[in-house]
Amino acid sequence: MSNLNNQIQGKIFYTSDLHLFHDNVIKLNNRPFQDMDEMVKFIVNKWNTKVKNGDLVRIIGDVGYPKNKQDVENVIKILSILNGDKELVTGNHDTKFLKEKSFRKLFKKISVYDYAKDGKRKVVLFHYPIEEWNGYHNGSYHLFGHVHGNEDNLKQIDRRFNVGMDVNGFVPVTLDELITKAKI
């Protein structure tokens, strides 16, 4: 279980599926941006307005979709200007980034799966949605991404939340925000 919880001074946020420099994501997921430049500026502005230094952002996969070395470098530059400490639970599009030391240094922790704490609550972080997770019967939460806004084929399960950019206003969210949103 993640031991960073004891060192966090601010809030804990979650997000996934930034898909920086994935030109097709705007069209594929009907994102409300004219181009990648507009999307990146929007995400950086919203992120840095909400997340403060001392906060922690747990990114649950797919930070980008690099076509080449320049895209990898651009994603690293963008991540470095985003506020807050960062942890990464890798997604299916993160492999190319993991080869870069300058990318790995941006994160306090990198894992494929994480069972962590958010205050006194336990959270299972995995890029893909899981039907039943560690602590499921004891009140733990599962936070995932990958599906963007396409949840039509997913069974609705209590305490399982999509933290993807596409369904959360393109900004990281807290567990409390997800719980409140689910009650509406």
List where the protein language model places each region:
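Acidic, histidine-bearing metal-coordination/catalytic regions of metal-dependent phosphoesterases
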Residues: 1-36, 162-163, 167-184
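Core catalytic region of metal-dependent phosphoesterases/phosphodiesterases
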Residues: 2, 13-15, 20-115
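Sterically constrained small-residue positions within well-ordered secondary structures
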Residues: 5-6, 79, 154
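A general structural motif
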Residues: 9, 53-54, 83-85, 120, ...
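Conserved beta-sheet core of the metallophosphoesterase superfamily
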Residues: 102-184
